[in-house]
Amino acid sequence: MARKDDLYQLLKPVVEGMGCDFWGMDYIAQGKRSLLRIYIDKESGVLVDDCEKVSRQISAILDVEDPIKGEYTLEVSSPGWDRPLFNVEQYKAYIGSIIEVRLQAPFNGRRKFKGLLAAVENDEIVLQVDAEEFIFPVETIDKANVVPQY
């Protein structure tokens, strides 16, 4: 597979050219058939029609450029209520929210943390979990999602 950065550089202009924000992407290897999930967003909200149009455009680009070797499924989606967080700017936008974080490697014997995103300083997040405060560099986070509050 192409590097994630290469895919990002290839696909971001396509998504933005269609009036959407490129929120992020996941590439999940699943045996013989992998999954490429692209998240798009819009201020007015993402409709199924938006996902369909962006999917067709991205599919055409991927067919021509062929950056992914082997079979894969392309999925285009809105980030949803439990939106994943991919970069520092997105973390900053959700300061004060409850988030779930899964680290690439264990910290204090665990990889999963859920707490209040208290701050973002430089490229690190400050997460308050009960009475404890943890500081994690964004680069050490494997996956993070906003926890919807109803």
Swiss-Prot record:
One Gene Ontology cellular component annotation held by this UniProt entry: cytosol
Plastid in keyword set: no
GO biological process, one term: ribosomal small subunit assembly
Location(s) in or outside the cell: Cytoplasm
Residue ranges crossing the lipid bilayer per the database entry: none
Keywords, in A-Z order: Cytoplasm, Ribosome biogenesis
Primary localization class, coarse: cytoplasm
HAMAP family assigned: RimP
UniProt similarity note: Belongs to the RimP family.
Function text: Required for maturation of 30S ribosomal subunits.
Full protein name: Ribosome maturation factor RimP
